[in-house]
């Protein structure tokens, strides 16, 4: 039928629907004819050159075809409109005034559009079903959508301007069914360029049953309740759900009552004439009602029993049963068919849907294997590249043809290079699966099998110039073993961003190296691989491609083992993806074998079952045969699954002696390597002799001797060892399953470092060794026993894997680097929770509920850990791998860093065994909660060295007393060495090198590595330190309200500044660096000082400012130094001690001598810039409690300190016991602060109004509490501070019981005023007495808001709980006015006069 015929009406189309001649339609001519028939005087429209701007999800690429979108601003004669079905959300915009273009649709939909919507028939063109039609040069086929009457899927084969075709499937709304797999037209679109997919239920929670099951349920309910005076109501759309109505009428043998509108619709569809439907309400008790009559279904079902009761009474029935057939109300539940009851009414939520559920969508994409999926529902289609679209497309990762996309990408290199060389005689077409049989004759005339001899030159020639430059840079940056193909794949993955390329490379370095080390595959091998992607319905060669180009298409060995986005795929999706590939590859002819040696094709790697090959023999079927027959079986199986057997042996680290046994297992598993591994590990006693010493060692797959709890006798143990019986810990075991006995709990004298370890000498240490120790230490209350366990753990590491000792120490101490390196994981609880959700397949709400109950994310992870079935069990976690991964996480910054961190964490989690995930999560959260930190780990490390050396070398030379002395001496030396040189990178290797000769003199202080600061004890008054300093000379110094700083000068002149925690803060104080350089003596080439940095107001006589002022100073970082010009808060440094100068360690010198050396380093000072701490000296003869002059002098000095805005004073011994002791808190240093002195500290009466869940030791309790005062003017509670000190464990337990049930509020009351957001809110019930150091202005807390500062409240620094106040009601607590007055009364406060 010619496209320019005048009969472009519905009736005209009907008359030609059976015509065997192919329809060839021209939309512009049809539109011109339609316009002319309506108004002959109407000028013929001018064809437009392009389609109006529309969403990508509505437009077919490279065409002017628009699907299901009719609200365009103007008409266009060249635009072809396609309507998939007659539902209002798809035909919105159509009306009787439509004249914007020609509408193509099915016959039934055309009738509905014309008769119901009154769209002029001249603009509606009905297309035949299952028949190819050419429209504007493109081929279009309509097939059944299984949605509603007249609903169709559109198959578009679009001709490109240059040459070739692109294929697209537009599903409209559809429900996938098995019949579609056999549709010949749809089969022709396997491997298409894109699928515009109905993603209504693209969510794993929507997996409702089949339509047949749902219809059967409705019919069974009607048959079961068929009584008199029972009315059945079925909710449906105006068009839709007809299938369920027809089945009810047919199987229940009764008519269906519909209203006039529904009847007219059914008549148009041809259903009303079958006698199944009636408008007479008295003819049947099954009535159809509107969609929302029985209740609202979105976003969740809300029944409308009121309306149901009205209908029941109006129609005179005693009972009413409603059915709401929809998938929206269904999620994975125990009861598929939920029922709501009320009185004599019930509503059945029937999971009947005419849209595909989640699994069906994935099956459909798996069947078609398109290059991409374009969602059409459930996202903002105006933002096609938005995150929601990308997130939805990830549901189909592994199901789309990603390899074809890579081929197209690399072929683009060839095209660009070919065009530059003006080799235009080769017509390159990228989509080989799209060529029809009639085009075979147009194939390249050259013919033959001209295969390039080398891939190297081709790759070089086909790379664009920009990528060539990038390749050169990558060759300089990456290791030499990285192949050019791998570089190209990385360039594509990261859009040429070299930073992302390099960072992602190192994330997957091990996998890339393993791939690069495989033999180079032959081109024939790759030809087989790519041929697997072409279905039997499309066997034709590519049109117009010369053999050279075909060879390139088939010859590229793109990375297949590594998926750079695999971290974003959920466990369920990963498993299904693997399964889909396996099933597809299994259909291939087993006789097709690659030629020559090389890397196995994907078919062979994923192959599970060979189709009845002659070599496939079941071991189980030969159990009665003689040994010779069994050997033949093994040989045959080995030949049939040779490559799988090789892989199996490699995974379990077996030798050739294991081959026969492995072949029998693999044959029993029919080539399924995962099943074979399960058999191997479930039947360990059957493993033949395979001596451990003969097995290869691998850093990724290790075997560990299995000594179960049941093997108590030495005979069993020896039998296990002699059999070579070993277990690979990559086998999933539950926490409750019997695991290797944890021998670290043995007494040190009975522990054998090598025999009791779970790995062998020379192998890398498994992470499970640490985890089992952590679990034992966690359950052990005694510190001595815990140290013994840690000692045993380290002994095995020293004996078997000394290179893993340092990473193990870091993991035991919850560190990944020395403090001064400022390297942190920088991950929060939300990221850990998100990774846990993906790794374990649980919901966020479940994680939150479990965390609220358990209070520890590690316990949550352990509880919800699930077995995840993968193609190959993941390798066991190694100590060094866990540590290196944590270091990788710490360096991830910038765009995409959160995703990369999450991927690394998920990868670790999925490899966890036993309790590994519990302690891994705790490590990520920086809280192991085993009660063993550095003070326990370091002595255990020293003990391990002595124990191993004693038993190995000195058993006869050392007496018991000497041994004990050495044990304690080395342990103490390790701790002391770390205090003066807190770098495990230095201490641990030195300890291993010196062995039992290690001592404190082994290491010395190093400028640039801060030592641990000396600490002071608290004194509650002046008299207290007189009692401790009788007849001993001492000094009193101001205790400044600033930041403790340790200042180092390095040999190269560099000045570094460290905080009291060892964090480097040099970038925050560039002005201080200049001051140190200016005033230090040139002769002092290196030194280490102890000082306090204080904010100062140099304009107002160098007045000292509060710590609050100093905290407003910019912090800076290694990558962003602040400049002296940008500094707004000036500082003065008060130096008071020196620990190291010019290579000499001064720690043992008395303070008096250290002061003298300090003044040699700084002979001059300058007020407001660098000063010595203000002090007074008390001689030994004056240090007496009876000396009232001295007592008065010190009291005056203390008051002077308060008036100078200091926290208090420091009292230090000058001569006796006056050394500098890192980390020590001794009587040699005492501190007297305002809130420690009786009579000086004011207390507040505050009300707890909320709390957070505790962490660490306080897990399961509430800590901290949010405290508030009361403002009687506004009648509201205003927050003052968080309190987390001063409580006992008994008090925590009491408060957990007290604040429960009705005392916990669902949300913050309107009369609570705060910027805090605690985990839960409490009703105002009790009053507590709180004491703090002083008051400060707060942007978060709201106490006294407007009374002191116009926009900020007042808070308390260092608050602590004193006691309960039982004689006051909550409204009688401290008021906002009280707090304001106390703020003004304090001597040290932030200057807020200039604040606005």
Swiss-Prot record:
* Main localization category: nucleus
Q: What induces it?
A: Induced by UV-C. Induced during seed imbibition. Induced slightly by bleomycin (BLM), a radiomimetic reagent that generates DNA double-strand breaks (DSBs).
Q: Which reaction does it catalyse?
A: ATP + (deoxyribonucleotide)n-3'-hydroxyl + 5'-phospho-(deoxyribonucleotide)m = (deoxyribonucleotide)n+m + AMP + diphosphate
Residues where ATP binds: 1037, 1044, 1060, 1092, 1136, 1212, 1225, 1231
Please list the tissues where expression of this protein has been recorded: Mostly expressed in buds and flowers, and, to a lower extent, in stems, leaves, siliques and seeds.
GO cellular component terms listed in the entry, alphabetical order: nucleus
For binding Mg(2+) 1, which residues are annotated in this chain's numbering? Answer: 1092
Keywords annotated in UniProt: ATP-binding, DNA damage, DNA recombination, DNA repair, DNA replication, Ligase, Magnesium, Metal-binding, Nucleotide-binding, Nucleus
Gene behind this chain? LIG6
Which family is this protein grouped under? Belongs to the ATP-dependent DNA ligase family.
Quote the CDD domains the UniProt record gives: Adenylation_DNA_ligase_I_Euk, OBF_DNA_ligase_I, SNM1A-1C-like_MBL-fold
What protein am I looking at? DNA ligase 6
Catalytic residues (positions)? 1039
């Amino acid at each position: 039928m010619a496209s320019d015929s005048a009969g472009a009406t519905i009736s005209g189309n009907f008359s030609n629907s059976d015509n065997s001649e192919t329809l060839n339609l021209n939309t512009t001519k049809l539109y011109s004819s339609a316009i002319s028939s309506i108004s002959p005087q109407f000028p013929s429209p001018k064809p437009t050159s392009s389609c109006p701007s529309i969403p990508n999800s509505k437009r077919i690429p490279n065409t002017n075809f628009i699907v299901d979108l009719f609200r365009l601003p103007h008409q266009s004669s060249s635009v072809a409109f396609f309507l998939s079905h007659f539902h209002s959300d798809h035909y919105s915009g159509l009306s009787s005034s439509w004249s914007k273009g020609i509408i193509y649709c099915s016959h039934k939909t055309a009738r509905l559009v014309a008769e119901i919507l009154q769209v002029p028939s001249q603009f509606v063109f009905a297309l035949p079903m299952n028949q190819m039609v050419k429209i504007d040069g493109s081929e279009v086929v309509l097939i059944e959508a299984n949605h509603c009457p007249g609903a169709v899927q559109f198959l578009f084969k679009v001709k490109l301007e240059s040459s070739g075709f692109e294929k697209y499937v537009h599903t409209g709304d559809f429900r996938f069914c098995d019949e579609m797999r056999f549709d010949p037209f749809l089969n022709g679109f396997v491997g298409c360029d894109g699928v515009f997919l109905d993603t209504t239920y693209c969510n794993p929670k929507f997996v409702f049953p089949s339509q047949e099951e749902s219809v059967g349920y409705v019919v069974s309910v009607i048959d079961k309740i068929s009584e008199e005076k029972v009315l059945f109501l079925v909710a449906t759309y105006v068009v839709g759900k007809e299938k369920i109505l027809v089945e009810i009428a047919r199987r229940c043998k009764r008519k269906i009552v519909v209203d006039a509108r529904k009847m007219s619709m059914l008549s148009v569809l041809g259903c009303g004439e079958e006698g199944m439907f009636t408008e007479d309400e008295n003819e049947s008790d099954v009535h159809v009602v509107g969609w929302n009559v029985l209740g609202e279904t979105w976003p969740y079902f809300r029944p409308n029993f009121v309306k149901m009761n009205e209908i029941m009474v109006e129609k005179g029935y005693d009972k009413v049963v409603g059915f709401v057939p929809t998938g929206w109300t269904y999620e994975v539940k125990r009861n598929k068919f939920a029922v709501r009851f009320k009185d004599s009414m019930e509503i059945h939520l029937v999971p009947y849907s005419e849209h595909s559920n989640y699994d069906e969508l994935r099956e459909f994409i798996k069947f078609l294997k398109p290059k991409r999926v374009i969602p059409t529902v459930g996202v903002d289609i105006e933002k096609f590249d938005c995150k929601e679209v990308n997130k939805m497309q990830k549901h189909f990762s592994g199901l789309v043809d990603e390899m074809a996309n890579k081929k197209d990408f690399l072929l683009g290199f060839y095209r660009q290079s070919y065009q530059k060389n003006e080799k235009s005689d080769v017509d390159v077409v990228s989509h080989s699966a799209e060529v029809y049989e009639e085009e075979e004759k147009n194939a390249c005339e050259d013919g033959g099998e001209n295969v390039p001899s080398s891939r190297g030159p081709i790759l070089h020639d086909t790379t664009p110039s920009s990528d060539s430059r990038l390749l050169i840079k990558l060759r300089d940056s990456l290791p030499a073993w990285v192949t050019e193909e791998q570089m190209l794949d990385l360039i594509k993955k990261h859009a040429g961003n070299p930073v992302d390329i390099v960072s992602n490379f190192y994330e997957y370095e091990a996998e890339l190296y393993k791939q690069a080390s495989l033999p180079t595959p032959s081109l024939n091998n790759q030809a087989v691989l790519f041929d697997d992607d072409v279905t039997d319905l499309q066997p034709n060669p590519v049109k117009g491609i010369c053999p050279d180009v075909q060879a390139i298409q088939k010859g590229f060995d793109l990375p297949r083992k590594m998926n750079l986005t695999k971290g974003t795929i959920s466990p369920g999706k990963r498993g299904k993806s693997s399964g889909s590939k396996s099933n597809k590859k299994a259909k291939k002819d087993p006789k097709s074998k690659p030629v020559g040696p090389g890397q196995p094709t994907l078919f062979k790697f994923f192959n599970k079952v060979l189709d009845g090959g002659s070599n496939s023999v079941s071991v189980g079927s030969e159990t009665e045969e003689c040994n010779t027959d069994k050997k033949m079986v093994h040989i045959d199986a080995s030949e049939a699954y040779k490559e799988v057997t090789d892989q199996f042996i490699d995974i379990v680290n077996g030798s050739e002696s294991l081959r026969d046994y492995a072949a029998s297992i693999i044959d029993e598993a029919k080539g399924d390597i995962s099943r074979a591994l399960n058999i191997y590990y479930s039947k360990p006693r059957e493993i033949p002799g395979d001596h451990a010493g003969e097995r290869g060692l691998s850093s990724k797959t290790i075997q560990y001797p299995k000594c179960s709890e049941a093997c108590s006798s030495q005979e069993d143990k020896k039998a296990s060892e002699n059999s070579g019986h070993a277990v690979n810990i990559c086998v999933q075991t539950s926490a409750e399953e019997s695991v290797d006995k944890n021998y670290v709990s043995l007494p040190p004298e009975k522990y054998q470092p090598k025999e009791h370890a779970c790995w062998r000498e020379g192998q890398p240490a498994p992470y499970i060794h640490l985890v089992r120790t952590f679990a034992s230490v966690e359950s052990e209350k005694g510190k001595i026993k815990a140290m013994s366990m840690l000692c045993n753990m380290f002994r095995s590491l020293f004996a078997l894997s000394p290179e893993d000792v340092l990473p193990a120490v870091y993991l035991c101490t919850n560190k990944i680097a020395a403090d001064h390196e400022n390297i942190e994981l920088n991950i929060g609880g939300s990221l850990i929770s998100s990774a846990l959700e993906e790794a374990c397949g649980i919901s966020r709400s479940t994680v939150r509920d479990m965390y609220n109950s358990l209070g520890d994310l590690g316990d949550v992870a352990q509880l919800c850990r699930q077995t995840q079935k993968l193609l190959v069990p993941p390798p066991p976690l190694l100590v060094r791998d866990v540590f290196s991964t944590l270091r990788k996480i710490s360096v991830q910054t910038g765009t995409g860093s959160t995703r990369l961190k999450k991927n690394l964490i998920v990868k670790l989690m999925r490899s966890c065994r036993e309790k590994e995930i519990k302690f891994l999560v705790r490590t990520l959260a920086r809280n192991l909660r085993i009660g063993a930190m550095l003070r326990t780990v370091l002595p255990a490390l020293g003990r391990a060295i002595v124990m191993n050396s004693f038993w190995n070398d000195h058993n006869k030379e050392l007496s018991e007393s000497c041994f004990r002395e050495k044990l304690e001496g080395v342990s103490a030396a390790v701790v002391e060495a770390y205090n003066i040189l807190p770098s495990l990178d230095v201490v641990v290797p030195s300890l291993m090198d010196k062995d039992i000769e290690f001592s404190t003199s082994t290491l010395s202080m190093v400028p640039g590595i801060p030592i641990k600061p000396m600490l002071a004890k608290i004194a509650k008054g002046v008299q207290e330190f007189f009692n401790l300093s009788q007849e001993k000379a001492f000094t009193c110094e101001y205790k400044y309200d600033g930041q403790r700083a340790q200042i180092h000068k390095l040999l190269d002149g560099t000045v570094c500044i460290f905080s009291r925690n060892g964090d480097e803060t040099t970038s925050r104080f560039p002005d201080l660096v200049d001051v140190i350089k200016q005033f230090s003596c040139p002769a002092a080439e290196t030194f280490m000082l102890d000082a306090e940095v204080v904010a100062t107001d140099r304009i107002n006589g160098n007045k000292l400012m509060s710590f609050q002022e100093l905290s407003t100073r910019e912090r800076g970082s290694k990558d962003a130094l602040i400049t002296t010009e940008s500094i707004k808060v000036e500082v003065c440094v008060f130096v008071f001690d020196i620990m190291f100068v010019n290579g000499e360690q001064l720690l043992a010198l008395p303070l008096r001598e250290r002061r003298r050396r300090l003044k040699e380093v700084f002979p001059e000072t300058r007020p407001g810039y660098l000063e010595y701490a203000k002090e007074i000296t008390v001689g030994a003869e004056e240090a007496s409690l009876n000396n009232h002059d001295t007592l008065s002098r010190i009291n005056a000095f203390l008051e002077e300190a308060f008036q100078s805005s200091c926290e208090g004073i420091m009292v230090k011994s000058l001569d006796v016991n006056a050394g500098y002791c890192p980390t020590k808190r001794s009587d040699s240093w005492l501190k007297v602060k305002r809130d420690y002195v009786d009579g000086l500290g004011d207390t507040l009466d505050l009300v707890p109004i909320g709390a957070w869940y505790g962490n660490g030791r306080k897990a399961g309790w509430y800590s901290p509490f949010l405290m508030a005062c009361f403002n009687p003017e506004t009648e509201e509670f205003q927050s003052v501070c968080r309190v987390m000190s001063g409580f006992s464990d008994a008090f925590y337990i009491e408060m957990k019981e007290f604040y429960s049930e009705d005392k916990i509020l669902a949300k913050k009351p309107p009369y609570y005023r705060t910027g805090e957001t605690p985990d839960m809110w409490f009703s105002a019930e009790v009053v507590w007495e709180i004491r703090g150091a002083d008051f400060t202005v707060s942007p978060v807390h709201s106490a006294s808001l407007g009374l002191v500062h116009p926009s900020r409240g007042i808070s308390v620094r260092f608050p602590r709980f004193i006691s309960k106040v039982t004689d006051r009601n909550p409204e009688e607590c401290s008021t906002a006015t009280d707090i304001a007055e106390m703020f003004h009364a304090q001597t040290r406060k932030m200057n807020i006069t200039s604040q606005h």
